[in-house]
Amino acid sequence: MSIYQEFVNKYSLSKTLRFELIPQGKTLENIKARGLILDDEKRAKDYKKAKQIIDKYHQFFIEEILSSVCISEDLLQNYSDVYFKLKKSDDDNLQKDFKSAKDTIKKQISEYIKDSEKFKNLFNQNLIDAKKGQESDLILWLKQSKDNGIELFKANSDITDIDEALEIIKSFKGWTTYFKGFHENRKNVYSSNDIPTSIIYRIVDDNLPKFLENKAKYESLKDKAPEAINYEQIKKDLAEELTFDIDYKTSEVNQRVFSLDEVFEIANFNNYLNQSGITKFNTIIGGKFVNGENTKRKGINEYINLYSQQINDKTLKKYKMSVLFKQILSDTESKSFVIDKLEDDSDVVTTMQSFYEQIAAFKTVEEKSIKETLSLLFDDLKAQKLDLSKIYFKNDKSLTDLSQQVFDDYSVIGTAVLEYITQQIAPKNLDNPSKKEQELIAKKTEKAKYLSLETIKLALEEFNKHRDIDKQCRFEEILANFAAIPMIFDEIAQNKDNLAQISIKYQNQGKKDLLQASAEDDVKAIKDLLDQTNNLLHKLKIFHISQSEDKANILDKDEHFYLVFEECYFELANIVPLYNKIRNYITQKPYSDEKFKLNFENSTLANGWDKNKEPDNTAILFIKDDKYYLGVMNKKNNKIFDDKAIKENKGEGYKKIVYKLLPGANKMLPKVFFSAKSIKFYNPSEDILRIRNHSTHTKNGSPQKGYEKFEFNIEDCRKFIDFYKQSISKHPEWKDFGFRFSDTQRYNSIDEFYREVENQGYKLTFENISESYIDSVVNQGKLYLFQIYNKDFSAYSKGRPNLHTLYWKALFDERNLQDVVYKLNGEAELFYRKQSIPKKITHPAKEAIANKNKDNPKKESVFEYDLIKDKRFTEDKFFFHCPITINFKSSGANKFNDEINLLLKEKANDVHILSIDRGERHLAYYTLVDGKGNIIKQDTFNIIGNDRMKTNYHDKLAAIEKDRDSARKDWKKINNIKEMKEGYLSQVVHEIAKLVIEYNAIVVFEDLNFGFKRGRFKVEKQVYQKLEKMLIEKLNYLVFKDNEFDKTGGVLRAYQLTAPFETFKKMGKQTGIIYYVPAGFTSKICPVTGFVNQLYPKYESVSKSQEFFSKFDKICYNLDKGYFEFSFDYKNFGDKAAKGKWTIASFGSRLINFRNSDKNHNWDTREVYPTKELEKLLKDYSIEYGHGECIKAAICGESDKKFFAKLTSVLNTILQMRNSKTGTELDYLISPVADVNGNFFDSRQAPKNMPQDADANGAYHIGLKGLMLLGRIKNNQEGKKLNLVIKNEEYFEFVQNRNN
């Protein structure tokens, strides 16, 4: 029996079951006759327009409300003080002070906005559908805008004018539930949390720092060069922009023209919160063009630029100012280059032309083109005329890519910086920094989001001091790499000339000729041009400082460099959406899966199923001959199933579902029993009224209006519960639920009683209705009847039904209804998808078809029916999405992990560890070990199936990936891999689940960050996080279809072995029986001795090599064994491992993978024998080794760099445990350290209870880390927090001591 036998019904969870709907009888004919589909299709299109209209209203509201927000000067000044201190010192306390300063301002703004009357209606039905006799806020605003002659919608808008907008909004009167999700999304716009799309974030996180930087520049400029700006001319030219209503410094309310000094008063930042204020401020900085005038009216930046040229002082450019970001949802907030969905070829070429014309016409604040600006910037950078301490590289994959590109080694820059920073922080303790020093080093290296160019320059200079001349990595080579950027612009310009001819060819609207094979050359030309532009952006990306990340670091930047660079970068960044839209257009599928919601003239369709609500929600469920049906009543005939109709039409045929629900007992019971019309019937006593008035029956409830809240009284609570019990027994409907309540004295709170009511306040019964009556109302168009359908209900269905079918059937099963596990929920939805491709028979019935799966022993199949490719898109389809609750009566899963750990502590001796690794030769590999670490089972998940047929998914996915990779590069149609992946994963998850139950196993994965998961293997094989998520969700509610319906593991008693999934970040290191252990040192570790390579030999120079080899205790030739031995203590190389002393040997051979010039530089493999390599090397340099004595001194006495380069290479070969041969499945592990019997582990000769290859070794050692956790769980003291963190030294000690 499984130890998890009682881990059932632990918590409830919700699922949405999805089915097709098949119209019955005259249903489809009647629907079309009434135009119901057309009505809902129009409503779906109008909904998109309505969202645009509501966004316009949000713009208006934001503009209006922010014009009256006033952030106190004290708060602004405090923010400023901390901000500038933080630029000088990255102190943790200052970071906290800065966060506090931000949060205080955000809170003040948020409270002001939320207190406004208009805000209260922004997200409820009153925005669109006001109370009777009143006009909604939205309608009123539209009418006022029309009366005031305000033009809300531009010429190219989807909405013609305000009259159309009014008609659209009025059409949603009574349909406001449509906007529930949209309103939730728009609430983020007003959030005070760190959400970049919030107006408060835009003010405090984005624009306030920019304003403060500009203020500081203005004050410095006035001090250094007061004559640079013509103040009087600006005041004259930009009088409109300098006019403000309020001077927040003096609190003067008087519309007047401000001086520049007043513009930069910190209190007057309040004038630049909304878009009109931002536009004014930006114009003051950048100037403006005025119709009819030949010259531009200069802003501050132009004056700085002119003065800098006049006195020939480029240093003044640092005073140029940055414009503020546009306010969220403003017309100008979105990028200037807006790309809609591309509908035809004309859209493609027109959009491309617009993009390149805009790039060519774009001018920076210096009135220069993008090419000219970047050329000058990078020329100055190459000449190192800029302050390198204030220019940064992004410290991510961009930096390692740059290192590879410039130095042909991805690790050079990172290694140089690490060594340099370590030397700065721990000069006396380089090999073994203290914990505090390690934290500081990490903060300035791998954890730093940006590295200054000065740091990189100094690091490389220091790095080169210890490297041979031909191994030098010069900083200048990095700068030269960017100086070549103008050449890329020239190449783009050449290819852009071809675009004109292509545009002419494809300018006709409505055509999709670019999707045809004949357009392949033109598609390639388009792609080449976009690729070049995209590559340019990627090259520049390393300099780009993300706005949100800058807030965390408060980088001290070269303001002029970033001012003009970011202008260019953001303009070029429009290539990303353009590229994606055009690629998606070219590679689009021939069919569309777009669907829209059906309402059948009822805004509350299927909102609930309660019998009393049937006339309102007009949706009813039926069962007939083990098939399920959904009926939708015509809105005008919504009483065709009232009690009278049911009574008159009883008979054989259909069973109608009668649904009764007592929802929200805490609100429903008092609402009913104390309502004005019912209070006499339920007749509460004076004592009960007293209890209710003062809320003494609740701990935190509210008293009735006009009464004071008295302290909770348990006796009053129980009196109130007895009143509720008596009243329920009187209620005409609720008395039939058959409530079985606990003894009143057992309740300790009113909430306990409410929970009992809700758990029993759900009831499904059935009424028989004659088939003739149903047929009659369908034929008359009073009822639209659909069969609820999936493949399990097909006459051709074979095998077991899927879980959604089992769940659906369980809803109506008497065994479920006796003690409810599955509950049917409201909020169901119906959808419609139109046919998008013609129906064409791919394989006629009764004709043999070759099986695609080469692993299938049956080579051909014959079907009794025609096969049609993508058949589901060749027909109009109806769909039904229905939510349900599983484990309806169960409570939450607050301490689920603790419960699991307590069980494992009690049953530790019966538990196995199932560890899963993501392999290089395996999609996934598992190892099952017992409580002593012995391997019980191990195998690959490459091949899944049964004895009749197994499928090699590794090969199938690899083949598809290869095709997809080629198609992606050439913009060809991409084969769908998603369904195969999910089919594969569902089978893997099922196999894991079986092992878990059979062996009482916990599951262990490596805790890899998302980037590592995405980057370690080919992208298309990145099934692992999906595997983890699918496994978690499977173990949320684990049903084995073979198990009996009401037995453990069956539909009614599913295992629950993981906590509900939210996000991987929130999940931490455990979710139920799944644990995450640190990644690293799992596949490249000796499974017998526990040896891991932490030497990492690397040739840099003769002196460094001499120093390195001198640290070995002994280097000699073993005369008895015939191989070389290197003895050392890790402590001499830095304290990195639990066991210090090791002897590694040149035993055996290794496989080296390399680019073979004789094979067109493709990957190839050669076998090398380290012992022979060393023998030859030592002989070549006349070093005697045959005596068996230590030769360390002779080695360190050499001075030839070729000698040490080769010796280092051979030592790396000896340390190479993992060996794989290109193009084959060969992937073995060989250890350089002998065990106590003098044997070297080699997975090719390993017994079945040891890892069989390198991937198996990875899974095995993940399992050993899991075994460590199991030991901690077993020994954990009650009440003490379980430590799930495994440090490397703890892990090394564990594995190295296991076999000793």
From Swiss-Prot:
Region annotated Binds DNA protospacer adjacent motif (PAM) on target DNA, chain positions: 671-677
Impact when changing residue 873 to A: Decreased pre-crRNA processing in vitro, no pre-crRNA processing in E.coli, binds RNA, no change in DNA cleavage
Recorded consequence of changing residue 671 to A: 15% DNA cleavage
Sequence segments annotated as region (Binds DNA in crRNA-target DNA heteroduplex): 301-305
Ranges for region RuvC-I: 893-953
The EC number(s) this enzyme carries: 3.1.21.1, 4.6.1.22
UniProt region (Wedge region 2), positions on chain: 592-662
Residue(s) at site: Binds crRNA: 833
Molecular function as annotated in GO: deoxyribonuclease I activity; DNA binding; lyase activity; RNA binding
Reported effect, residue 1006 to A: Loss of target and non-target strand DNA cleavage, no change in DNA-binding or pre-crRNA processing
Region span, Binds crRNA alone and in crRNA-target DNA heteroduplex: 47-51, 182-186
Region Nuclease domain, annotated ranges: 1079-1254
Swiss-Prot/TrEMBL keywords: Antiviral defense, Calcium, DNA-binding, Endonuclease, Hydrolase, Lyase, Magnesium, Nuclease, RNA-binding
Keyword Magnesium attached: yes
Outcome of swapping residue 1024 to A: No longer cleaves DNA in presence of Ca(2+)
Coiled coil: none
Reaction catalyzed: Endonucleolytic cleavage to 5'-phosphodinucleotide and 5'-phosphooligonucleotide end-products; RNA = a 5'-hydroxy-ribonucleotide + n nucleoside-2',3'-cyclophosphates
Positions of the UniProt region annotated as Binds crRNA: 591-595, 791-794, 803-804, 851-853, 865-873
Site (Stabilizes transition state for pre-crRNA processing): 852
Subunit structure, interactors included: Might be a homodimer. Might be a monomer.
Similarity-based family: Belongs to the CRISPR-associated endonuclease Cas12a family.
Name of the protein this chain belongs to: CRISPR-associated endonuclease Cas12a
